[in-house]
């Protein structure tokens, strides 16, 4: 992951900004104005592309399942509604990722109600390359407050949770988070037997490619499908940085350029959605699950992150700092390590996740940090200019595609906020290959321990939002109860095409 470097020194005033009164400035008048602007964009898009028929308004649920409702564009143009939106039942954030079972404990209210998904006009309105009669936009949830009779941000919306975290960090310290993800996935050729077993899945990919890391031949074997995937991503405005084959047969990684963290999460979703769709239309299954095959390496979505000030200068690098990082970024990392066990519940949400998180798997399960250390929870990537310019970003290695990126990033911001606010210095860094000699703590080795750590972490739950933390905990416990009753292979087959 390459980021522009900026050696601007940290301003000590960053610690003295006591403006921590943050709120989401989305009153009804602004929402209506935004809707009018969206209507004009739709008119322009329809005029340029007469084939357009539907606009998909998308949301990401607690379990990181991509969901959508599609509105007929002609209906919008004929009716010109005051507020373009779709209504969704308020149980939508209590559903399991693999079945529409309601988790009652996840809901604050026992009453049925509606949440209103309103398109976000600051996100891109993309024509879908794999379904060119549809355009897509992300939405955020609001609810009608009975007392004020006004629309308010819904507390069970993951996107709203991240926005609150972004506002908190910016208003208190004048800092914003930028980043991107390493998107790792497997491409599996659909077989004649419908890939009814994990063994048949493995056989189908090994027929094509006996992969190794950065294998030149792998890009040739999968050249046609990879070209369609990368073209589709670029058509949606995603700037691709790198493409490479990973260590597994049929395993690849695509990295997208860094950006503000909310947009990075949106791009992360678009990548998975696009790769899944293009693969399916071309006779492949694309899977992002953490550990589809025991004999092959797992897939993660490592997050590369950096801290920026209000002048859009990178606060992360400092050539004279530990591991080439500024003091503020070291404190941020101190907070992340302090909360690492609780964050694991947000990052790794299925039993399958923990088959990837093992020592010597380079998955970051050691609660430590270090320069170029692939065994540490936080790795500091070096560059040819690290000695003179410092290091421009830090990497969290454990995150996988079962995580809701908005909740994961909200957790990261609040953990880092704690580190900055309380000047939490991280332990000494290490770059030892074998960290077992250091007696480092490990992150939880199973979801039950991770979720218990999150439940007991009142600071994180309160700041992420007690309502959405409760929903996450109960939905994931319900999912994991079902998954734990299945064999490892049946778990894989159940999750294979969900992530």
Swiss-Prot record:
Domain GS beta-grasp: 50-146
Family annotation (SUPFAM superfamilies): Glutamine synthetase/guanido kinase
Coiled-coil ranges (or none): none
Record has Nucleus as a keyword: no
Residues annotated as domain GS catalytic: 158-499
GO terms, biological process: glutamine biosynthetic process
EC category: ligase
Catalysed reactions, as listed in the record: L-glutamate + NH4(+) + ATP = L-glutamine + ADP + phosphate + H(+)
Pfam families, A to Z: Gln-synt_C
Keywords annotated in UniProt: ATP-binding, Ligase, Nucleotide-binding
InterPro entries with a match to the protein in the record: Gln_synt_N, Gln_synth/guanido_kin_cat_dom, Gln_synth_cat_dom
GO molecular function, one term: glutamine synthetase activity
Homology family: Belongs to the glutamine synthetase family.
Protein name per UniProt: Type-1 glutamine synthetase 1
Lineage: Eukaryota, Amoebozoa, Evosea, Eumycetozoa, Dictyostelia
Gene that this polypeptide is encoded by: glnA1
